[in-house]
Amino acid sequence: MNSYNIYKKNNEATILYHAIARDEDQVMELAKEAGIDMDGLRIELERANVKDQLGKPLSARIEDALIY
C-alpha cells in the first residue's frame, strides 16, 4: 500500500484528502465510493510501501485531510 495526498490542481499548498491505496486507480475508486468529485483534483504519491507500527500493510481508505 502507498500513501497519497489529494489537492486542487491550482493549489498544492492545501491537501484536501489523504488516501492509503495500492495505486492511483484504487484512489479513484475509493473517492467515487466516498462521493468525492475528483474533477480538478490531483493525486500525488506521498510515500510508497506504508505500514503500521507493527510492520503490517495498512488497509485501503480515503479521509478528509482538513482540520476544522
Language-model segments: residues:
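A short, exposed loop/beta-hairpin motif centered on an aromatic-Gly-Thr core
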Residues: 13-23
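Generic helix-packing signal
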Residues: 23-25, 35
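Short, mixed-charge low-complexity intrinsically disordered segments
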Residues: 33-68
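Short aromatic-glycine-(Arg/Gly/Cys) micro-motifs in beta-strand/loop hairpins
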Residues: 1-14
